[in-house]
Curated annotation (Swiss-Prot):
Record family assignment: Belongs to the lyase 1 family. Argininosuccinate lyase subfamily.
Annotated localization: Cytoplasm
Listed InterPro entries: Arg_succ_lyase_C, Argininosuccinate_lyase, Fumarase/histidase_N, Fumarate_lyase_CS, Fumarate_lyase_fam, Fumarate_lyase_N, L-Aspartase-like
NCBIfam families: argH (TIGR00838)
SUPFAM superfamilies xref list: L-aspartase-like
Gene Ontology molecular function terms on file: argininosuccinate lyase activity
Superkingdom of source: Bacteria
Official protein name in the record: Argininosuccinate lyase
Length: 460
């Protein structure tokens, strides 16, 4: 008989049982569910709603069930619907009628809310740790490449010379913000809903603060309707996860391009590449491509949650059972991508000579020629026009800007002197950009130092 079956005269249709059941995916909440039940039973005993002896029996039974689940001795029952009913059913079978007192002053509505929040808190901690490891890898790589010149791009066209370290540090800032977003999400998840009941609280004299203390929550919810009916914390996590994936996907897109023969900026390690079933020469960046592809999957999880929630009246609705698969999938996907991306990045070979060669082509020093004129008093817009003509002339003559003679420069503007050549070497162009946040080696090293300090603070 169903634990809620007293009002019903017929058994549930088997098709409905399968359709209705969530145990296939919410069984991963078993630790949190049992932990929440142990805290609830302990609190019930403390305030005298059940006897201390009954509370002890329940706690002992729950701990035994936890051990049995982890030993693989438990086969969950689809007919019991979900992890909550499965655990309660197992408990009653183990300790008898006392087990039926566990659900006193509790609904599955506040029970599932506390389970998800506890689970998400643990996942956020794990994902933040993975992001921290990734940022540390980026910092280590950046320190090795503060003098590795490469082209910076806009519109996928070579724009200005930078360093590989500067490029890596851009991603370090993105992933640091991702860590910050997860920290904020954790704060809003760290609110205990248990004690809210189905929607209207309870008539029992619960000590919610004590339960929150037992479960490690920083705060207790202030409105029972809100506590059981919203999943904005899950949406917030999926939004943060989507941004992590977006940053990973952008980086992977560049890695895929850099690994092509046309760019040849990097070589991926064999351990993070695959071959072709027909073309013997192929070395494919499948890991990066899969991460790029899985990004859309996490976006879908976010959209699914938002769409599921948008039309729900207060308070709990069965639609909300659909929150878990989207949330769990986003968690699993982000973790899996971070776990494989970091070592792929750490083991790739950087082809510095090809990066430097690319930086010297494409007139990446054109802006520096314009800056040269502006520093000598030529209005920048006039300088821009002069250099544009110089580039056009170089294209006609098949020359680089540094290959023009001083006479050719003076035909463009009498302001040019011999010192133009020292000002437009790509290494100088990079080194001259010492402004905070710029690509000069000393500026990048300062950024690395600041980021290490911020990373340390985030970890505290």
């Amino acid at each position: 008989m169903k634990l809620w079956g007293g009002r019903f005269q017929k058994t549930t249709d088997s098709l409905v049982e399968d359709f209705h059941s969530s145990i296939s995916f919410d069984q991963r909440l078993y630790k949190q569910d049992i932990r929440g039940s142990i805290a609830h039973a302990t609190m019930l005993g403390k305030v005298g709603i059940i006897s201390l002896e009954e509370a002890a029996q329940i706690v002992t039974g729950l701990k035994q069930i936890l051990e049995e689940i982890e030993a693989g001795k438990v086969e969950f029952d689809v007919a019991a619907e979900d992890i909550h009913m499965n655990v309660e059913q197992l408990l009653t079978a183990k300790i008898g009628a006392v087990g039926k007192k566990l659900h006193t002053a509790r609904s599955r509505n506040d029970q599932v809310a506390v389970d998800i929040r506890m689970y998400l808190k643990d996942e956020i901690i794990e994902i933040r740790a993975l992001l921290k490891e990734l940022v540390e890898t980026l910092l280590n790589l950046a320190e090795q490449h503060t003098n590795t010149v490469m082209p910076g791009y806009t519109h996928m066209q070579r724009a200005q010379p930078i360093t590989f370290a500067h490029h890596l540090m851009a991603y370090s800032q993105m992933f640091m913000r991702d860590m910050g977003r997860l920290t904020d999400c954790y704060k809003r998840t760290d609110v205990m809903p248990l004690g809210s009941g189905a929607l209207a609280g309870t008539t029992f004299p619960l000590d919610r603060e004590y339960t929150a203390e037992l479960l490690g929550f920083a705060a207790v919810s202030d409105n029972s309707l809100d506590a059981v009916s919203d999943r904005d914390f899950a949406v917030e996590f999926c939004a943060a996860a989507s941004l992590i994936m977006m940053h990973l996907s952008r980086f992977c897109e560049e890695i895929i391009l850099w690994a092509t023969g046309e760019f040849a900026f990097i070589d991926l390690d064999d351990a993070y590449s695959t071959g072709s079933s027909i073309m013997p020469q192929k070395k494919n960046p499948d890991v990066a491509e899969l991460i790029r592809g899985k990004t859309g999957r996490v976006y879908g999880d976010l959209m699914g949650l938002l769409t599921m929630l948008k039309g729900l009246p207060m308070a709990y609705n069965k639609d909300m059972q659909e929150d878990k698969e989207a949330l769990f999938d986003a968690m699993d996907t982000v973790k899996g991508c971070l776990m494989v991306f970091r070592p792929m990045l750490a083991t790739m070979t950087v082809r510095q000579e090809n990066m430097a060669k690319a930086a010297r082509g494409g007139f990446t020093n054109a802006t520096d020629v314009a800056d040269y004129l502006a520093k000598k008093g030529v209005p920048f817009r006039e300088a821009h026009e002069v250099v544009g003509k110089a580039v056009f002339y170089c294209l006609q003559q098949n020359k680089a800007l540094e290959e023009l003679t001083l006479e050719e420069y003076k035909e463009l503007s009498p302001v040019f002197e011999d010192d133009i050549y020292a000002a437009i070497g790509v290494e100088y162009c990079v080194a001259a950009r010492k402004v905070r946040g710029g690509p000069a080696p000393e500026a990048v090293q300062q950024a690395i130092t600041r980021t290490k300090e911020r990373l340390k603070q985030l970890g505290e």
